[in-house]
């Protein structure tokens, strides 16, 4: 007799500079049964990129076919190329008991909440303070002062949406944040086992 459980769709959102990318990388490195969501795109592969690992590379015609068939959870056009989240990749992993990590902004997260709320566990990552966020953005040395101000204004807007998420954490220490999200993921996996057991002879 075997107890089966679906995986969890772990959605992480944060303002730019709050540490979402670093936390995601560490979670994937440390967690078992957790994979990164692989997006689909119509752009050409760059040197070294692997189809199915970095992206699913498809023609624009194929991309639009999948959109019309309802096979894209979310999609957008960026610099003349389309990018989207393929439904099959997410659902196949979840049904196999593998959790999927998706780092997206609040708009993408809210769209997913509408489509598959029961499968989503969402975490909003906050910086310790707006001043700390400003310092982190300045340390990147990739944006000028006006761009940093724009990002900070956008961050305020994003932070105002945090109450719609299942969990909110403050990232003042990367390792502690990774540990906290790992605990959330394990708790939600156990909850799924209790809620939805299916027994096989």
UniProtKB/Swiss-Prot annotation:
Its EC number is 2.7.4.8. It catalyses: GMP + ATP = GDP + ADP. It is an enzyme of class 2 (transferase). It is found in: Cytoplasm. ATP binds at residues 14-21. Residues 7-186 form the Guanylate kinase-like domain. InterPro entries: GK/Ca_channel_bsu, Guanylate_kin-like_dom, Guanylate_kinase, Guanylate_kinase_CS, P-loop_NTPase. PROSITE patterns: GUANYLATE_KINASE_1, GUANYLATE_KINASE_2. Keywords: ATP-binding, Cytoplasm, Kinase, Nucleotide-binding, Transferase. GO terms for cellular component: cytosol. HAMAP family: Guanylate_kinase. Belongs to the guanylate kinase family. This is Guanylate kinase. It comes from Wolbachia pipientis wMel. The lineage of its organism: Bacteria, Pseudomonadati, Pseudomonadota, Alphaproteobacteria, Rickettsiales.
